[in-house]
Amino acid sequence: MRRPAILAAAVLLAPLAACSTVKEAVKGPDLAPVGYPAPLAPMQQQYVSAREPAPQAASANSLWRVGARAFFNDQRASRVGDIVTVMIDIDDSASTKNATNSSRTANMKAGVPHLLGMESSLGKFLPGGFDPASALETNSTTTNAGSGGVSRSEKISLTIAAVVSQVLPNGNMVIQGTQEVRTNAELRQLTVAGIVRPEDISSANTIRHTQIAEARISYGGRGDISRVQKTPAGQSLVEKFSPF
């Protein structure tokens, strides 16, 4: 009874998987949502529970507030709704080159001096005769050569303002920001999201993209130019599902 149920479930779930594949082929892959913690691998992540920040005790007869980083006021983002400037300066490059060469030659020769006394009689039935000293002989030669290379370079230099959307129990903050610029019929979109530490925010209320955990950075656009540069949906589907 269980086998038909499993087959029925597979049949019902197959269209859902196909729909997801079709959507990705047409619209492109989506960024993973930002959460805390975000699953970095297909397994259950175990994290130490974040501790609550220690309460700030008031200092009697003092103008200095415990935990403050400035004498008058800390102007850096620290609460939900505060704005922090994200400095994005990506200049990455990678180059890989591999080459493989292999060859192998094998020879084998075997004789049968005695074959139940029939070694002399076999020559009468075989067209070329029978030589017991070279009854079996094989030769094989294998040669394999392969090479591959990957070269990639990315450079992005942008500045975007993000909003604190959540303050975690340990004091870290979840930020997310979106910037859109429209030029004629082309819309450029820049999004950034991730988790930052208050200590990493500079006195100018800025933070570098390398200091953002679970960073999700997207730079793209949509419009007439992007539509022309994009592969048609029909062609994408054919290339996605074609076995050749």
UniProtKB/Swiss-Prot annotation:
The keyword Transmembrane does not apply. Keywords: Bacterial flagellum, Cell outer membrane, Lipoprotein, Membrane, Palmitate, Signal. Pfam families: FlgH. NCBIfam families: PRK00249.1-5. One of its GO terms (molecular function) is cytoskeletal motor activity. This is Flagellar L-ring protein. It comes from Caulobacter vibrioides (strain ATCC 19089 / CIP 103742 / CB 15) (Caulobacter crescentus). A lipid is attached at C19 (N-palmitoyl cysteine).
